[in-house]
Curated annotation (Swiss-Prot):
One term of GO molecular function: ATP binding
Alphabetical keyword list: ATP-binding, Cytoplasm, Immunity, Inflammasome, Inflammatory response, Innate immunity, Leucine-rich repeat, Nucleotide-binding, Repeat
Disulfide bonds: none
Protein's name in the database: NACHT, LRR and PYD domains-containing protein 9
Domain NACHT: 146-465
Documented effect of changing residue 425 to D: In a breast cancer sample; somatic mutation
Summary of subunit composition and partner proteins: Sensor component of NLRP9 inflammasomes. Inflammasomes are supramolecular complexes that assemble in the cytosol in response to pathogens, such as rotavirus, and play critical roles in innate immunity and inflammation. The core of NLRP9 inflammasomes consists of a signal sensor component (NLRP9), an adapter (ASC/PYCARD), which recruits an effector pro-inflammatory caspase (CASP1). Within the complex, NLRP9 and PYCARD interact via their respective DAPIN/pyrin domains.
Organism in which the protein naturally occurs: Homo sapiens
Pfam families tied to this protein: LRR_6, NACHT, NLRC4_HD2, NOD2_WH, PYRIN
Length: 991
């Protein structure tokens, strides 16, 4: 093949591109020995006066076929004409590419046999022209993008587009000058491959007549990998785990895929990947700088054109289109090309049978049930019900087995094992439920396989022999709503939908044989069981549970299930989520806590008033549950955006007298510029906690809030304003609240730049006789030692303040000395003092030790993250041994202490009768130091109950010593990070 190509190709065109001096130099090089090729030179007598035409003939004469080209290309480089070398290489590749021809034949067949367009190709190209342009532009040199992701839900056309671009490349109509080799990898076909190499994987489709496949890797920038089928991938891919750059080495399949996706293997190559909803969650984060192309489906005009092409006859197409358009939910579903095909197929067969133009479209389950009954009726009329039932059950068993085992292409053996003959397989192909895949079979679409898998549970009987590969109803419910999302999630959602009396009745009427009536009861029992186990209850994915409940459209069933749960977390990211959440939440009667994230709903930038008003309708419906549910107490919203109208609806509901809300938590919430929130706080007498952590507040917002808090009707006791961008300028407003609101007991201002100026204002209020604050959290507030004199005055004056958090402020030794002077005063009532990360040294410990001896009220002292060293710890331990010391908790985590002071710590553990908790976390103690501590812990006089220590950070022998002590002392717990959760909760970072 190579010889015929070179003889036809012709050198003359390239020689004519040489300038006079370049051509002369070219001839001079030809007269020299060609040692690299082990060829003799062409005699100078023949070359000297030879024209370009003559030289072309001489090259062909002396170096026949491919040799002439190898010599010519080598000489082009020597005369600095790399442009000609590059162009010739590219043309040679294009001509010498049997692989491209092989792919053209393969994908032409796939396009004709396996793609369900039912429309002219020019219509398809017109609907996808924007995506085509994006794909073409994505891989240009200017774009510098090597990874492109096609994103869209199932049925939107991702696979169809990938097949089309593969065919277009093979035909030379796309990326002609960009990619020499394009490989189409259907990753679900790799489920059965344990170990291979990339070279071996690609060799499966490599024509024997082509060049060595190894040669293609010399220019990886000319390679594109098209990857599809991630939804059906059986194994999980890991981020940066055991990646490899060796395309020759055999290794586990997940490593090869992970290495390609993360650009460890062939980093200069390009990727084109299709990801649906599930695969986006599992794999998108692994990609490096991907360009995202979203497939949006059909517009209204494209839907109309699709109907026209599908039905052919214009009057019939228009009649069906108008019918579907008048059916709102059904028309919305038809933006998805596959769903549109389902609808058209259902309607067409009904019309052909002379039936009414009717299709139930309450939800997706109804649509698939209608499709199944329509095609089943068309192909099974000549068989008795018993035979039809057996055949349908066998088909659904095949689908279920495939989903549970991640099998999507079925051999004749697979069919036989599930009770299907080859002729029955052909029958299902005729009904458009299966399709041919070479000598095997596959379902027409993954969604159809998922629906048929759900139908298996409606068709199976208790006496049937179990298939060990297919999970039970209980296992499917758990897989749907507890485990991470898999294909079983959608099967479970379909199972919810087909369990309803209405759908069971519809299916029985159409099929002509009875179906299980117990499915819904079994689902209910499974969910009740999950709700009663704390671990399962906390792991429930309410997003999926709500979708399943919504599919039933049975209010009584939804109410019964939702009454199993008192706490729900739900994410609302689009209008569909909002519709489903509003439907389910309004049927919750026992719900006490709702944790909710609302994104991409409000504000609405679409410009469509009707769509926006529709969102507000469903939002109002959702918020109504705060009024109707008498048990509701906690609303926790995080990472949420609300505009003024949506906030007004929420606040109106929360302000109703019948709303029993006790805690309102807004974490990182944007709520516009309306003060409705604060009015709701004022008018709800049950509300005791308000948290706005991470929510940016303007000075105006703070002033509105403070006016609310000063009102006699306000009942707020805990106020969390951490990380709210509060500066010293508004501290006067906050101070005015402290001075007059005797109900406020807890205030967190962590992570705000209050500075010393703001602290001075707060301290004046804290000294006020009406101030009843008990806990004040001021971590990361940009305070210095300057504030300590004012704080000291508060410690002397305040009779209510029991916990003061000054962590992560630069108080330094001199600042703490001022605090200690106040702490030693008998009138000081503080019980907990947090001084972590306050830039303290051992110099401060003398003053602190004196406090421990004389202040019997101080129970907790946290000094972690300070450079107090062994010297400082010794002073503290001496104080702990004093009989007047009543300290119960001491925090020293990450303090740079060594074995040298462990004897002092041990002595303190034995002598101090009140010390219950000691935190030594993140301290690099050696084995000898641990032995000393363990001996003290084992002493009968040691009263310690909690030791903060990172056990797994020690060697195996030391870990055994620590575990042995824990086992020997029942009241002792040794744990890592023992106070973190409690500290976060008190500060309001996590509630």
């Amino acid at each position: 093949m190579a010889e015929s190509f070179f003889s036809d190709f012709g050198l003359l065109w390239y020689l004519k591109e040489l300038r006079k001096e370049e051509f002369w130099k070219f001839k001079e090089l030809l007269k020299q020995p060609l040692e690299k090729f082990e060829l003799k030179p062409i005699p100078w007598a023949e070359l000297k006066k030879a024209s370009k035409e003559d030289v072309a003939k001489l090259l062909d004469k002396h170096y026949p076929g491919k040799q002439a080209w190898e010599v010519t290309l080598n000489l082009f480089l020597q005369i600095n004409r790399k442009d000609l070398w590059t162009k010739a290489q590219e043309e040679m590749r294009n001509k010498l590419n049997p692989y491209r021809k092989h792919m053209k034949e393969t994908f032409q067949l796939i396009w004709e046999k396996e793609t369900c367009l039912h429309v002219p190709e020019h219509f398809y190209k017109e609907t996808m022209k924007n995506e085509y342009k994006e794909l073409n532009d994505a891989y240009t040199a200017a774009a510098r993008r090597h990874t492109v992701v096609l994103e869209g839900p199932d049925g939107i056309g991702k696979t169809t587009l990938l097949r089309k671009v593969m065919l277009d490349w093979a035909e030379g109509n796309l990326w002609k000058d960009r990619f020499t080799f394009v490989f189409f990898l259907n990753v679900c076909e790799m489920n059965g491959i344990a170990e291979t190499s990339l070279l071996e994987l690609l060799s499966r489709d490599w024509p024997e007549s082509s060049e060595k496949i190894e040669d293609i890797f010399s220019q990886p920038e000319r390679i594109l990998f098209i990857m599809d089928g991630f939804e059906q991938l059986k194994f999980n891919l890991q981020l940066k785990a055991d990646l490899s750059d060796d395309w020759r080495q055999r290794q586990p399949m997940p490593i090869i895929l992970s290495s390609l996706l993360q650009k460890k293997m062939l980093p200069e190559s390009s990727l084109l990947i299709a990801l649906g909803k599930l695969a986006m969650q599992k794999h998108y984060f692994m990609l490096r700088h991907p360009k995202l192309i979203k497939l949006l489906g059909f517009s209204e005009s494209e839907k109309k054109s699709y109907f026209s092409y599908f039905f052919g006859e214009k009057s019939k197409a228009l009649k069906v289109f108008n019918f579907v358009r008048d059916n709102g939910p059904l028309f919305i579903l038809c933006h998805n090309p596959f769903t549109c095909w389902l609808v058209c197929t259902c309607v067409k067969q009904r019309l052909e049978r002379g039936e009414d133009l009717e299709i139930n479209s309450q939800n997706t389950t109804y649509l698939y049930a209608s499709f199944l009954t329509t095609v089943f009726k068309a192909g099974s009329q000549s068989f008795p019900p018993k035979v039809n039932r057996a055949r349908l059950k066998s088909l659904c068993a095949l689908a279920a087995e495939g989903i549970w085992t991640y099998t999507f292409v079925f051999s004749h053996g697979d069919l036989r094992r599930n009770g299907l003959s080859e002729s029955e397989g052909v029958m299902w192909v005729g009904m458009r439920l299966l399709q041919r895949r070479g000598d095997c079979f596959a379902f027409m679409h993954l969604c159809i396989q998922e629906f048929c898998a759900a139908m298996f549970y409606l068709l199976k009987r208790p006496k049937d022999d179990p298939n060990p590969a297919i999970g039970s109803i209980t296992q499917l419910v758990r897989a749907s709503v507890v485990q991470p999302q898999t294909l079983l999630t959608q099967v479970g959602i379909f199972m919810f939908g087909i369990s309803t009396e209405e759908i069971v009745s519809m299916l029985e009427t159409s099929f002509g044989f009875p179906l299980s009536k117990d499915l819904k009861q079994e689902i209910t029992q499974c969910l009740e069981s999950l709700s009663q186990c704390e671990a399962d209850r906390e792991a429930i994915a309410f997003q999926e549970l709500f979708i399943g409940l919504f599919e039933t459209q049975e209010k009584e069933f939804v109410t019964k299930v939702m009454n199993f749960f008192e706490e729900v977390f739900i994410y609302i990211g689009n209008i569909e989520h909002l519709v489903i959440a509003s439907f389910c939440l309004k049927h919750c009667q026992h719900l006490t806590t709702l944790r909710m994230c609302v994104e991409n709903i409000f504000p609405d930038d679409s410009g469509c008033i009707s769509d926006y008003n529709e969102k507000l309708v469903y939002w109002r419906e959702l918020c109504s549950m705060f009024i109707t549910n008498k048990n509701f107490q906690i609303l926790d919203m995080e990472n949420t955006s609300l505009d003024d109208p949506s906030l007004a609806i929420l606040c109106k509901a929360l302000a109703q007298p019948v709303c029993k809300l006790r805690k309102l938590i807004f974490t990182s919430v944007y709520f516009g510029h309306d003060s409705e929130l604060f009015k709701a706080v004022l008018h709800n007498p049950h509300l005791k906690l308000l948290s706005l952590y991470g929510t940016s507040l303007s000075q105006s917002d703070i002033r509105h809030l403070c006016e609310t808090l000063k009102h006699p009707m306000c009942k707020i006791e805990e106020l969390i304003l951490g990380k709210c961008d509060i500066s010293s300028e508004v501290c006067e407003d906050i101070a005015s609240v402290l001075a007059c609101n005797s109900k406020l007991k807890h205030l967190s201002l962590v992570e705000n730049p209050l500075r010393d100026e703001g602290m001075t204002l707060l301290c004046e209020a804290l000294k006020h006789s009406h101030c009843a604050l008990e806990r004040l959290m001021l971590m990361y507030c940009c305070l210095t030692s300057v504030s300590c004199d004012s704080i000291s005055e508060v410690l002397l004056c305040s009779k209510s303040l029991s916990l003061l958090d000054l962590g992560s402020n630069a108080l330094e030794d001199n600042g703490v000395a001022s605090l200690c002077a106040a702490l030693k005063h008998p009138g000081c009532s503080i019980r907990e003092l947090w001084l972590m990360g306050c830039f303290l040294t051992s110099d401060s410990c003398k003053d602190i030790a004196a406090v421990l001896i004389c202040n019997g009220k101080l129970k907790t002292l946290k000094l972690g993250h300070n450079e107090i060293g062994d010297t400082g710890v010794r002073q503290l331990c001496a104080a702990l041994q004093h009989p007047h010391c009543k300290l119960e908790c001491l925090g020293l985590q990450t303090c740079p202490i060594t074995r040298a002071c462990c004897d002092d710590i041990a002595a303190a553990l034995i002598a101090c009768k009140t010390l219950r908790s000691l935190n030594l976390d993140w301290i690099a103690l050696d084995a000898d130091a641990v032995v000393v501590l363990c001996e003290a812990l084992s002493h009968p006089d040691c009263a310690l109950q909690m030791l903060g220590l990172h056990k797994s950070g020690f060697d195996e022998e030391t870990q055994k010593i620590l575990m042995s002590v824990e086992e020997k002392i029942p009241h002792l717990t040794i744990s890592h990070g023992p106070w973190i959760d409690e500290e976060y909760k008190i500060r309001g970072v996590l509630l």
